[in-house]
Swiss-Prot record:
InterPro entries: CheY-like_superfamily, HATPase_C_sf, His_kinase_dom, HisK_dim/P_dom, HisK_dim/P_sf, Sig_transdc_His_kin-like_C, Sig_transdc_resp-reg_receiver
Miscellaneous remark of the record: Thailandamide is a polyketide that is toxic to human cell lines but also has antibacterial activity on E.coli, S.typhimurium and S.aureus. It probably acts on acetyl-CoA carboxylase in the fatty acid synthesis pathway, which is rarely found to be an antibiotic target. These data suggest it might be a good starting point for engineering of novel antibiotics.
The species this protein was found in: Burkholderia thailandensis (strain ATCC 700388 / DSM 13276 / CCUG 48851 / CIP 106301 / E264)
Traits of the deletion mutant: Increased production of thailandamide. Inhibits growth of Salmonella in an overlay assay.
A UniProt-annotated Pfam family: HisKA
Keyword Cell membrane (UniProt): yes
Response regulatory domain span: 484-601
Any one GO cellular component localisation term in the record: plasma membrane
UniProt protein name: Sensor histidine kinase AtsR
Length: 602
């Protein structure tokens, strides 16, 4: 069976080669016949018409001669008619002389070139002598003799062109018939070879036809499913992005109101209630942040910074705001950096977000024991890497789920962890950030014992000139009794909350809902601080800020501080940034607002 198959394959190859060679020859003949502009020119002649142009000149020559006879015999004494026919004759001859497809065609023929050159000299004589006949009509007969002497050459030139055209058409038509016959014969041979080839191919692959159809159907179904999946992912990302951004404004009212309450004296019972509200709001804010970050990472190409980063202080900054949750769950947390003064060149914000998400994930799924965060330098001097590890004694992850935990919205469907808050986006964000830094993340986990996430990132060691800034940030004020602020936000809850937060900082606040109202209020009392929403219903926050800047002198001793806020981070990328002193995404926290005001007003 294999010998027959091998013989069939050799026959197929031989017949296929013959058919390809024959088809190439057939295609060349067909292209030579129909596809080239040279053959088309030979068949049709120039598109302007060789004989037609010469015939027009002959007709004009005849009319000029007849008009000149009438003038010479005084049958028509109007000399303008002679000049009119001369102009017509010159125009007709101009078509012969001027560079064109036609002139290029016949000037390549020696006889035609010589005749046209002689007629050109004769036309020059006519242009010189004929205008003088108006005053000396008696010279008309001499000119008529010259015209009559050149008439045979004009007539012969037209007839010559006609003969050339006819001869070329006959020759080309003969070639056309010969090539057509060759094409038909070669096509017949190719058809026979192709038929034999197809029969042999059908005989060889008849058992594979059904399988190929099934495979094609499966590929089509997969492609359609893939297209639908991409469309659904794009629609989902757009929807989730919109939802996450729309949640930021009500979160501003929730978080801000809670922090204002916490800034006031409260009873123990009220404090417990407010703390529960704060924890729930923080959980909701974290979920919205994860969702927004993931959509932003998937929708845009994030630029990665490379600045000196002190790892120990960075990880301490990650751990400090989470110590309250760690303490509430009675966990122990440790931090180790090797070497302790490790400084690398990388993107500080991305590393901080990676570490923060991993630590928060461990806190969620660890009910007792420890959470250990470590960072160490690894690799070789030419290929430095940094490993950040977060190890916990939590519930652990089953092996069959390790490949899924970095998928968006994935949550372990286990009774022991169903109570854990979250939408399954924290690790998906980690994966996207690690990829952005050209690193990778590994997971080791045992159910009931805990998990360890190890992030490996390529880094560089900074030189002496790249040392991080050791200057301590300025101390923040807690009250600003002498300041007067203007809050412009179309959302009433957010506006009232921002006003209450400023009041909690000791700042008097005026509240307005539109850009025009805000400008009117600022015109009545130039404020020290303007908290301005970028998306206002009448005019944009950028326009409001520009008008405020125009209304105040840049040399004034008391310059107005303008703070731009928005639920949409993309809105902060538009407009003129120079008119704002700072941008803050919603929700704004009280300590953040206090820090910004202190820094900008110091």
């Amino acid at each position: 069976m294999s010998r027959v198959k091998w013989r069939n394959e050799k026959i197929i190859v031989a017949l296929g080669s013959l058919w390809i060679l024959g088809f190439a020859a057939w295609a060349f003949l067909l292209f030579d016949l129909l596809g080239t502009s040279v053959k088309e020119g030979i068949l049709e002649g120039p598109r302007e018409g060789v004989f037609w142009t010469a015939a027009q000149y002959r007709n004009s020559f005849s009319r000029f001669e007849r008009q000149l006879i009438l003038y010479a015999t005084r049958q028509d004494r109007d000399f303008d008619n002679v000049l009119l026919q001369l102009d017509s004759l010159e125009a007709s001859f101009g078509f012969l002389e001027r560079p064109s497809e036609v002139s290029a065609y016949w000037l390549s023929i020696p006889k035609a070139r010589d005749d046209i050159a002689e007629l050109s000299r004769f036309m020059a004589t006519l242009r010189r002598d004929v205008p003088a006949l108006g005053a000396r009509a008696g010279d008309s007969r001499r000119v008529l003799e010259d015209v009559a002497r050149h008439w045979p050459k004009v007539n012969a030139l037209a007839n010559y062109f006609r003969a050339i055209e006819m001869e070329q058409r006959d020759f080309t038509f003969h070639q056309l018939k010969e090539k057509r016959r060759a094409i038909v014969m070669l096509g017949g041979v190719l058809g026979v070879i192709l038929g034999a080839l197809f029969l042999l191919l059908f005989y060889t692959i008849r058992t594979r036809g059904s399988l190929l159809e099934q495979q094609q159907a499966a590929l089509d179904a997969q492609r359609k499913a893939s297209d639908r999946a991409f469309e659904m992912i794009a629609a989902k990302n757009a929807f989730l992005g919109m939802v996450s951004h729309e949640l930021r404004t009500p979160l501003q009212a929730i978080c801000g109101s809670i922090e204002v309450l916490l800034a006031r004296p409260q009873s123990d019972a009220n404090m417990k209630t407010i703390k529960r509200l704060q924890n729930s709001a923080a959980s909701l804010e974290a979920q919205v942040k994860d969702l927004t970050d993931y959509i932003k990472l998937r929708s845009t190409n994030r630029s990665v910074q490379s600045d000196p980063v002190e790892i120990a202080p960075l990880l301490a900054d990650v751990l400090d705001p989470l110590r309250g949750r760690i303490r509430d769950k009675h966990l122990n947390a440790s931090l180790r950096v090797e070497p302790p003064d490790l400084v690398v060149k990388s993107d500080r914000k991305l590393i901080q977000q990676i570490a923060s998400n991993l630590v928060e994930n461990s806190i969620k799924y660890t009910n007792s024991g420890t959470i250990a965060i470590s960072a160490e330098l690894a690799g070789t001097p030419s290929n430095r890497t940094m490993q950040i590890a977060v190890r916990d004694t939590g519930v652990g992850i089953a092996k069959n789920l390790l490949s899924k935990i970095f998928e968006p919205f994935f949550r372990v469907n286990d009774p022991g962890v169903r109570h854990v808050d979250g939408i399954g986006m924290g690790l998906a964000v980690v994966q996207e950030l690690v990829v952005a830094l050209r690193g990778h993340v590994d997971v080791r986990s045992v159910v009931g014992e805990g998990s360890e996430f190890v992030v490996t990132l390529p880094v560089e060691l900074p030189g002496s000139a790249d040392a991080p800034d050791d200057d301590a940030p300025p101390s923040l004020q807690t009250t600003h009794r002498d300041l007067h602020a203007l809050v412009v936000d179309d959302n009433e809850n957010a506006r009232e909350t921002l006003g209450a937060m400023l009041t909690a900082l000791g700042i008097r606040a005026d509240l307005r809902g539109t850009g025009k109202e805000g400008l009117r209020c600022f015109g009545e009392c130039q404020h020290d601080i303007v908290v301005l929403d970028l998306e206002l219903p009448d005019i944009s926050g950028f326009e409001v800020a520009e008008q405020i800047r125009w209304a105040t002198s840049p040399d004034a001793a008391k310059k107005t501080t303008i703070l731009g806020v928005s639920a949409y981070e993309s809105a902060m990328l538009k407009g003129d940034h120079a008119v704002f002193d700072a941008f803050v995404p919603k929700p704004i926290h009280l300590d953040t607002l206090n820090g910004i005001v202190s820094r900008l007003r110091s």
